[in-house]
Amino acid sequence: MESVAYILVLTMALSVIFFAIAFREPPRIQK
């Protein structure tokens, strides 16, 4: 189950980076 935990941590890291970039830049898509 180490691989599952590694994938989970990697996904969390990518999501944190994605949200950091998304909130840093102004929203280009207005709904």
Curated annotation (Swiss-Prot):
The keyword Nuclease does not apply. The chain crosses the membrane at residues 3-23. The keyword Isomerase does not apply. It is a single-pass membrane protein. One of its GO terms (cellular component) is photosystem II reaction center. It is found in: Cellular thylakoid membrane. Pfam families: PsbT (PF01405). It comes from the Bacteria. Its main location: membrane. Keywords: Membrane, Photosynthesis, Photosystem II, Thylakoid, Transmembrane, Transmembrane helix. GO terms for biological process: photosynthesis. PSII is composed of 1 copy each of membrane proteins PsbA, PsbB, PsbC, PsbD, PsbE, PsbF, PsbH, PsbI, PsbJ, PsbK, PsbL, PsbM, PsbT, PsbX, PsbY, PsbZ, Psb30/Ycf12, peripheral proteins PsbO, CyanoQ (PsbQ), PsbU, PsbV and a large number of cofactors. It forms dimeric complexes. Belongs to the PsbT family. PANTHER family: PHOTOSYSTEM II REACTION CENTER PROTEIN T, PTHR36411. Found at the monomer-monomer interface of the photosystem II (PS II) dimer, plays a role in assembly and dimerization of PSII. PSII is a light-driven water plastoquinone oxidoreductase, using light energy to abstract electrons from H(2)O, generating a proton gradient subsequently used for ATP formation. This is Photosystem II reaction center protein T. It comes from Microcystis aeruginosa (strain NIES-843 / IAM M-2473).
